UniProtKB/Swiss-Prot annotation:
Organism of derivation: Arabidopsis thaliana (Mouse-ear cress)
Domain of life: Eukaryota
Name of the gene: GBF3
Gene Ontology MF term list: DNA-binding transcription factor activity; sequence-specific DNA binding; transcription cis-regulatory region binding
Name of this protein: G-box-binding factor 3
Cellular component GO terms, alphabetical: cytosol; nucleus
Bias-annotated ranges (Basic and acidic residues): 1-16, 155-165, 182-199
Subunit structure: DNA-binding heterodimer. Interacts with GBF4. Interacts with BZIP16 and BZIP68.
PANTHER family the record matches: G-BOX-BINDING FACTOR 3 (PTHR45967:SF1), G-BOX-BINDING FACTOR 3-RELATED (PTHR45967)
Amino acid composition bias (Polar residues), ranges on this chain: 111-130, 202-216, 357-366
Lineage of the organism: Eukaryota, Viridiplantae, Streptophyta, Embryophyta, Tracheophyta
Compositional bias ranges of the Low complexity kind: 166-181
Length: 382
């Protein structure tokens, strides 16, 4: 961008009579001022007045162009063109949307890389509006598209004001859109203010202009850069912006949390099942070892029992033989004893007989001696 003296002068009017101007009594000079007031609140400082003559005097131009003028209450009812949903979710543009994932900080409300695109239906007013549209486009990190009511051409009006004035200074007033509508994306970086061909290029912080889609509505918050996209803007249209769109709705985060909890439960169940399976396997192996030890001990006891049974059988056989031997040896011992007893008994009987005989002989002798007379009588009688 160069100084105001370097800007091309508009061609002088010819002497031919021009057509009578169209009556523009009800047309506002700033067609999108109400939309801007709806989007800006007391938290965001509005740019001051910009005088192009200051650039010619050698002073650096201020970053803003006009002072704030509150035409509507900042916390009033939301503007229908900006908040088509009625303001139920987004009560004010300064309020962040939803909750962020854990471990991340809240993005700033407004950062130098913010891109605002507001399209409201306006009417084309010829060269006057065209000139105003060219001058009201440069902000310090806040790029706002000012269109003529066509939503498909609203985001294509992000142009550098000085370059557009150099290239489109002589366009007719029938169309309120600036040239370069086919430019889909515009990248700006705030790395410095280089000069090229004696013209100072004021570069704002990096932002990407995106074109709104016809079906999408609502305001989307870009995570990381703190940018608020206009209604219907798709952030996937730029590959550089797709990386910063990590903001996920709370329902998705809740679903992800449920899935993570479910996976943790499944993993814990698998681990517990594996531990129980290993414990049961260890118990089974220990029981198998005990069974083997008990079976071996049982076999040893059975073998000892068999040996004891064999020994008992042998002892029984020996006892039987001894009993038989005892039975055979008892009669031989009794015969001599009987013989001796008989001998003794017979000796005593003989003595008794001899003694009785002797007694009878003596008595008979006594009788004979005593009975001599009766015998003689008997003999005499006989």
């Amino acid at each position: 961008m160069g100084n105001s003296s370097e800007e091309p002068k508009p061609p002088t009017k010819s002497d031919k009579p021009s057509s009578p101007p169209v009556d523009q009594t009800n047309v506002h000079v700033y067609p999108d001022w109400a939309a801007m007031q709806a989007y800006y609140g007391p938290r965001v400082a509005m740019p001051p007045y910009y005088n192009s003559a200051m650039a010619a005097s050698g002073h650096p131009p201020p970053p803003y162009m006009w002072n704030p003028q509150h035409m509507m209450s900042p916390y009033g009812a939301p503007y229908a063109a900006v908040y088509p949903h009625g303001g139920g979710v987004y009560a004010h543009p300064g309020i962040p949307m939803g909750s962020l994932p854990q471990g991340q900080k809240d993005p700033p409300l407004t950062t130098p890389g913010t891109l605002l695109s507001i399209d409201t239906p306006t009417k084309s007013t010829g060269n006057t509006d065209n000139g105003l549209m060219k001058k009201l486009k440069e902000f310090d990190g806040l790029a706002m598209s000012l269109g003529n009511g066509n939503p498909e051409n609203g985001a294509d009006e992000h142009k550098r004001s000085r370059n557009s004035s150099e290239t489109d200074g002589s366009t007719d007033g029938s169309d309120g859109n600036t040239t370069g509508a086919d430019e889909p994306k515009l990248k700006r970086s705030r790395e410095g203010t280089p000069t090229k061909d004696g013209k100072q290029l004021v570069q704002a912080s990096s932002f990407h202009s995106v074109s709104p889609s016809s079906g999408d509505t609502g305001v989307k918050l870009i995570q990381g850069s703190g940018a608020i996209l206009s209604p219907g803007v798709s952030a996937n249209s730029n590959p550089f912006m797709s990386q910063s769109l990590a903001m996920v709705p709370p329902e998705t985060w809740l679903q992800n949390e449920r899935e993570l909890k479910r996976e943790r439960r499944k993993q814990s169940n698998r681990e517990s099942a594996r531990r129980s399976r290993l414990r049961k396997q260890a118990e089974t192996e220990e029981l198998a070892r005990k069974v083997e030890a008990l079976t071996a001990e049982n076999m040893a006891l059975r073998s000892e029992l068999n040996q004891l049974n064999e020994k008992s059988d042998k002892l029984r056989g020996a006892n039987a033989t001894l009993l038989d031997k005892l039975k055979c040896s008892e009669p031989e011992k009794r015969v001599p004893a009987n013989m001796l007893s008989r001998v003794k008994n017979s000796g005593a009987g003989d003595k008794n007989k001899n003694q009785g005989d002797n007694d009878s002989n003596s008595t008979s002798k006594l009788h004979q001696l005593l009975d001599t007379k009766p015998r003689a009588k008997a003999v005499a009688a006989g």
